A protein has these predicted regions:
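Extracytoplasmic/periplasmic substrate-binding proteins
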Residues: 47-65, 170-177, 184-190, 224-281, ...
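Conserved small-residue motifs centered on glycine
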Residues: 368, 375-500, 509
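Conserved N-terminal structural module of periplasmic/extracytoplasmic solute-binding proteins
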Residues: 11-196, 258-259, 468, 472-545
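Short, solvent-exposed loop/beta-turn-alpha elements that line the ligand-binding surface or hinge
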Residues: 33, 127-146, 189, 245-264, ...
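Helix-loop-helix "hinge/cap" segment bordering the ligand-binding cleft or interdomain interface
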Residues: 129, 155-230, 251-293, 297, ...
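C-terminal motif of bacterial Sec signal peptides marking the signal peptidase cleavage site
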Residues: 6-10
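Paired acidic/hydrophobic, glycine-rich loop segments that form the ligand-binding mouth/hinge
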Residues: 104-108, 304-309
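Carboxylate/His-rich catalytic cores and anion/metal-binding grooves
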Residues: 113-152, 201-204, 213-250, 305-318
Length: 545
């Protein structure tokens, strides 16, 4: 994403030259861990509407840039500033590329994957993997090594062009949220299997769990206006009970990638959903509900079960108490299917990328910056500069002689959002492991653990333990590359075919056996070729070098 000048001048041939690794042009001098004289890092990143500054501060002058200058001798400068809304950042960056404008040292981005691939394919970025191996701290390397496949989206010709921005692992992996007060009232047992769950759904649908004398409740809320396998009000786990996960590429027993929506288990899951629709266990409007709208059926007191991430007590589950102050909800594990299988979609450890301009004079300066955040901010020790947060008066304050992160005391500022990588630094496993530790009744001993304990509701802590206890059932999206040639041509047709067929089967407008014809048509309409291309990509990125 950086230096484009030389690129467009040579693109009339259609060839892309591989960028040579960046080599420091001048040795930097450090005194007491700080560059002296200071070094400047120019950069680009989108600025979202969730980022707010104190009066007198802005993107180039704030508590974070002051910290970088005072502590590390690094002067951070935006090449230009653009908001992330309405694709403004993407539009301006593409215009800069087209006009051969000068690019900054660093581009840090989370958003449109096609833009990332466009930038990588310009050949203007170094093999960041080589720089990472040379300059990254042990803490950062260990965090990255928790899942090396996080590099895959940013690889080209075996080179790691972009450095993945790490996020907390399992953050979107689902658990089953059930109205616990309804469970108690109807004397129901925890569901371990789909059969157990059907008993609960039948009771929620037919035994008046809210006690209002009306038949106005049902079992499970889902929404598949977008997809069945989705981030909230999810139905992917139903397919997991039959050994697959739809709308993603899964690793099969032969070590090959397979599109989950054409796996035979999908037919069984669709038959199950059709049965539940007929019995009134799921909403008749499920096909037009998106994720948020479907979840509102739970918070409105209509549905007794919703499946989604461990953080749902923060939003939107507490809204159920607006309708019924005595309402209770509890997290349960994902149940297994008739053959003992259970599955849920997994969540990537990556959430964005950093690209380094091949013309950056001193790329090691970026690693000095990010290493410090991984070593001191990601999981600070007692007495460390970031023990209570990034900066007093911003994300933490003293109240009654104790540090607090309560927004009423701090003003609700989040200086980690000012950083080059949007969140400061995150060790993927740390958040969920901390939550699981607290759920087991262990004492919070580290600053990170104490911060989590003080700010996270107990149901969320309990749910996190379930997520970790069931980590072996997670099924990750294994294709994370750019759309293949045939995908670009045929994906719209294939997606419409899939959505239409699945919806018709669930609603009973087509027989379950229509799935077999769908698979045949999917393969003939480009799916077979896409499968070949996806596996060629997978072999290229996963091959041992």
């Amino acid at each position: 994403m950086f230096a484009l000048s030389a690129i467009l001048s040579g693109c009339n041939s259609g060839a892309t030259k591989e960028a040579a690794p960046s080599t420091p042009s001048a040795a930097l001098t450090m005194k007491d861990g700080k560059y002296d004289p200071p070094v400047t890092i120019s950069y680009l990143r989108p600025w979202g509407p969730d980022v707010k500054f104190k009066s007198g501060e802005d993107q180039d002058n704030n508590v974070h840039t002051k910290w970088a200058k005072d502590t590390l001798g690094i002067d951070l400068k935006n090449q230009w500033i653009s908001p992330s809304t309405n694709n403004a950042f993407e539009t301006k960056l593409r215009l800069s590329l087209a006009s051969n404008a000068e690019m900054p040292d660093i581009i840090s981005y989370r958003g449109e994957f096609n833009l990332v691939r466009e930038l990588i394919e310009t050949g203007k970025f170094v093999d960041a993997g080589e720089l990472f191996d040379k300059y990254a701290s042990d803490t950062w390397k260990a965090a990255m090594n928790e899942d090396p496949s996080v590099w895959y989206p940013y690889m080209q010709d075996g080179k790691r062009i972009g450095i993945p921005i790490l996020d907390y692992s399992y953050n979107g992996d689902p658990v089953m949220w059930i109205r616990e007060d309804w469970m108690k009232k109807l004397n129901l047992k925890a569901p371990e299997t789909l059969a157990d769950l059907e008993t609960i759904m039948d009771a929620f649908t037919n035994q008046d769990p809210d006690g209002n004398g009306k038949k106005d409740t049902y079992g499970l809320t889902i929404g598949f206006k977008n997809w069945l396998n989705t981030w909230m009000s999810d139905a992917g786990w139903i397919f997991g009970a039959y050994g697959t996960m739809p709308n993603q590429w899964n690793l099969n027993a032969d070590g090959k990638l397979e599109y989950g929506s054409v796996n035979p288990g999908t037919k069984q899951a669709l038959a199950t959903l059709h049965d539940w629709m007929q019995k009134g266990y799921i909403p008749e409007e499920a096909g037009v509900y998106d994720e948020t709208k479907a979840s509102e059926e739970f918070t409105a007191g209509k549905a007794g079960i919703v499946v989604g991430p461990h953080w749902m007590p923060s939003w939107p589950l507490e809204d159920v108490k607006k309708n019924d102050p005595k309402a209770e909800y509890k997290a349960y594990p994902i149940p297994s299917g008739p053959d003992g299988k259970a599955g849920r979609h997994g969540t990537s450890n990556g959430n964005g990328v950093v690209l380094i301009n091949k013309d950056m004079k001193n790329p090691e300066a970026f690693f000095t910056y990010q290493n410090y955040l991984f070593d001191h901010y990601a999981n600070p020790k007692a007495g460390d500069v970031f023990e209570n947060g990034f900066a007093e008066g911003y994300d933490w304050a003293m109240k009654d002689g104790k540090p607090t992160t309560d927004a009423s005391a701090t003003g609700g500022y989040a200086p980690e959002k000012y950083t080059l990588t949007f969140d400061g630094a995150r060790i993927p496993s740390l958040s969920m492991e901390t939550l699981a530790k607290l759920a087991s009744g262990e004492e919070a001993t580290t600053p990170f653990e104490k911060k989590i304990k003080s700010g996270v509701p107990q149901p969320m802590i309990d749910a996190a333990k379930i997520v970790l206890d069931q980590k072996d059932i997670a099924m990750n999206q294994m294709f994370t590359g750019a759309p293949t040639m045939t995908m670009q041509m045929n994906n719209d047709i294939l997606s419409k075919m899939e959505k239409d067929t699945f919806s018709q089967i669930i609603y009973g407008k087509a027989p379950v056996d229509a799935f077999d014809k769908f698979v045949e048509n999917w393969n003939a309409s480009g799916g077979e070729q896409i499968t070949k291309e996806v596996n060629e990509w997978y072999q290229s990125v996963s091959a041992k070098k």
